[in-house]
């Protein structure tokens, strides 16, 4: 099935649909790794990407953000000099009512009859003010952390800000 634009899934509609034990055929989320770099490292600065409005983030967007931020940090500061953490998990199951197109579609298609939809993916529900991605890093690499979070934020369907959670006195903006 084709990946549809994120704007289709961005809005919260109704309660979260998460009970996988009752849902058949939920595809696994594309994002499997949530900690990158050096999780055991001792870093003085912690920077986070914060959502400015509530939204749903698809598992594809989370994976794209992870790859973008991790690749940038690995190339610029090295794998042992940071810890990148994705702080949300795609629990919410997305559904789609498949509509047939092309010749003879009217004979095959059900239309809005039995329109509940089949599971097509998962999404994380993000609240306003929630931290989505966090980078722990040394003060000399602070600008690289900000750029990595900016690149990750471009993959999300909501406006964001980058805030310093720890070590604000060590970095001068």
Swiss-Prot record:
List, alphabetically, the GO terms of the cellular component aspect. ribonucleoprotein complex; ribosome
Which Gene Ontology molecular function entries are recorded, alphabetically?
A: structural constituent of ribosome
Please give the superkingdom of this protein's source. Answer: Archaea
Q: Does the keyword Ribosomal protein apply?
A: yes
* UniProt entry keywords in alphabetical sequence: Ribonucleoprotein, Ribosomal protein
Q: Does the keyword Ribosomal protein apply?
A: yes
InterPro entries associated with the record: Ribosomal_uL16, Ribosomal_uL16_arc, Ribosomal_uL16_CS_euk_arc, Ribosomal_uL16_dom, Ribosomal_uL16_euk_arch, Ribosomal_uL16_sf
The record, for SUPFAM superfamilies, names:
Ribosomal protein L16p/L10e
Q: Which Gene3D superfamilies match?
A: Ribosomal protein L10e/L16
GO BP of this protein: translation
HAMAP family, per the entry: Ribosomal_uL16_arch (MF_00448)
Concerning its family, UniProt says: Belongs to the universal ribosomal protein uL16 family.
User: What protein name does the entry list?
Assistant: Large ribosomal subunit protein uL16
Upper taxonomic lineage: Archaea, Methanobacteriati, Methanobacteriota, Methanomada group, Methanopyri
């Amino acid at each position: 099935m084709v990946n549809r634009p994120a704007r289709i899934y961005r809005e919260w509609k109704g309660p979260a649909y998460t009970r996988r034990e009752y849902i058949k055929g939920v595809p696994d989320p594309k994002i499997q790794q949530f900690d990158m770099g050096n999780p055991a490292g001792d870093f003085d600065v912690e920077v986070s990407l914060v959502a400015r409005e509530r939204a749903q983030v698809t598992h594809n967007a989370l994976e794209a953000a992870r790859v973008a931020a991790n690749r940038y940090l690995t190339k610029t500061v090295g794998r042992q000099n940071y810890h990148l953490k994705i702080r949300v998990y795609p629990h919410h199951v997305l559904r789609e009512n498949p509509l047939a197109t092309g010749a003879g579609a009217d004979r095959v298609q059900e239309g809005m009859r039995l329109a509940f939809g089949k599971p097509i993916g998962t999404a994380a529900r993000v609240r306003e003010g929630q931290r989505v991605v966090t980078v722990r890093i040394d003060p000399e690499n602070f600008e690289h952390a900000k750029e990595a979070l900016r690149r990750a934020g471009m993959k999300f369907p909501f406006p964001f800000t980058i805030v310093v959670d720890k070590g604000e006195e060590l970095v001068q903006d």
